[in-house]
């Protein structure tokens, strides 16, 4: 029995969704909270940030460093190169970079301005100061606690739930901050302009229908600065990844093997941006859901398609609203770190944005999302490292295939694996 006989004709899903002014405000605030610049892989940077803050609280250079971290942090830091360290990898290297040369006020750009002399100091510090690393058994999925000591003094700083959310500070046993979800840096990242905006925007307002409607009707002046920065930063690192020798050079392999059709370029450039980033490229990216790789994946394929099809700047930015918000919507229930590969949700979201960019509405976007998730949903996260680039290429390919399936009248149905209806 074929699919059409079993399930009936290919169904349309179009329906009208009206967004309120408050919905528009919330969607824009979500983007402002999420689409922030980061320098290097966000987990090592979060560790460097936490360590820099601990040194600041201590008030002197530590002579002993104790790092406690959740399993997700450990797997995402152990194999990735920490930028501006001369190629160093690992948890102690990230912490040492923050302690020696970090500026905690710069948040996710905490080690963006490390000098060559400071790189030497980081290496010397690692050789001369004892570091210990322990797994946290009772914390959040994203959890870091750095304890620093010098003579009779000590300081403890804890970051939890989000990459720059400091929830605990103590010096010599005196608690200075305890279990707060907001801090100066988090407020800076959210670019809050009122006290009410200190609390993170309500992600439960997001829906696929609402996202598509928002992309059609949003006042771009409220978010264009974020999106234009994403285009500039993320396409820049993708170009560098293609032109230079980074990581496993997945992007170059794809282009050399399959040519430069738009689908191959979309996969290749996204992969190349990740390869560069995972291998210590000293360029910033605009992140999504706390991840630079996801930020690259939701944006670069859409940029490639916009260039290929000569789309206007406005059309590109509206498509990026789709990819960014769908990725955030998917990740909201999963969390910023998990055993699930975040490139999957980002690649699926990119496919949805391409469908929207090429004239699709909720029907095209929804079917693209279901089809693409059904293809790549089983990929696990085994840490941040160069092979992320290959996973990104596969996920972008699944996103595009999901859309092409829709265009050819094909779809996955309920009871097909993860698909429920």
Identify what each model region corresponds to.
Residues 45-148:
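Early transmembrane hairpin of solute transport permeases
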Residues 27-36, 73-82, 276-287, 327-337, ...:
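Glycine/charged-rich beta-loop-alpha catalytic/anionic-binding loops adjacent to active sites
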Residues 126-280:
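Signature of multi-pass transmembrane helix bundles
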Residues 260-264, 277-310:
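Membrane-embedded translocation segments of transport machinery
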Residues 54-57, 83, 305-318, 322, ...:
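Hydrophobic alpha-helical bundle architecture
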């Amino acid at each position: 029995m074929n699919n059409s006989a079993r399930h009936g004709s290919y169904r349309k899903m179009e329906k009208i969704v009206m967004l309120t002014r408050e919905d528009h405000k919330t969607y824009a605030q979500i983007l402002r909270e999420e689409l922030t610049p980061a320098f290097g892989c966000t987990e090592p940077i979060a560790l460097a940030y936490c360590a820099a803050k601990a040194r600041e609280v201590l008030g002197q250079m530590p002579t002993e460093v104790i790092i406690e971290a959740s399993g997700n942090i450990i797997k995402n830091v152990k194999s990735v190169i920490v930028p501006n360290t001369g190629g160093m990898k690992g948890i102690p290297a990230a912490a040492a970079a923050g302690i020696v040369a970090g500026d905690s006020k710069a948040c996710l750009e905490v080690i963006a301005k490390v000098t060559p002399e400071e790189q030497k100091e980081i290496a010397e510090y690692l050789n001369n100061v004892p570091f210990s690393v322990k797994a946290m058994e009772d914390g959040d999925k994203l959890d870091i606690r750095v304890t620093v000591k010098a003579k009779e003094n000590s300081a403890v700083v804890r970051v939890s739930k989000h990459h720059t959310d400091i929830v605990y500070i103590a010096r010599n046993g005196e608690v200075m901050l305890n279990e707060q979800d907001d801090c100066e840096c988090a407020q800076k990242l959210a670019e809050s302009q009122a006290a009410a905006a200190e609390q993170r925007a309500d992600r439960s307002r997001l829906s696929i229908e609402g996202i598509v409607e928002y992309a059609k009707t949003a006042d771009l002046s409220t978010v264009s600065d974020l999106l234009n920065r994403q285009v500039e930063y993320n396409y820049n690192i993708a170009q560098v990844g293609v032109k230079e020798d980074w990581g496993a050079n997945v992007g170059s392999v794809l282009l050399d093997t399959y040519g430069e059709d738009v689908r191959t370029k979309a996969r290749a450039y996204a992969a190349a941006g990740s390869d560069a980033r995972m291998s210590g490229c000293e360029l910033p990216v605009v992140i999504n859901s706390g991840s630079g790789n996801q930020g690259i994946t939701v944006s670069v394929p859409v940029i490639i398609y916009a260039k290929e099809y000569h789309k206007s700047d406005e059309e590109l930015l509206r498509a990026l609203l789709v990819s960014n918000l769908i990725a955030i919507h998917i990740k909201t229930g999963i969390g910023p770190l998990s055993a699930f590969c975040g490139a999957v949700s980002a690649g699926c979201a990119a496919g949805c944005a391409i469908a929207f960019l090429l004239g699709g509405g909720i029907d095209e976007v929804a079917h693209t999302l279901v089809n693409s998730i059904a293809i790549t949903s089983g990929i696990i996260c085994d840490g941040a490292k160069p092979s992320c680039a290959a996973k990104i290429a596969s996920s972008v390919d699944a996103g595009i295939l999901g859309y092409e399936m829709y265009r050819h009248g094909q779809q996955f149905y309920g009871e097909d694996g993860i698909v429920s209806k």
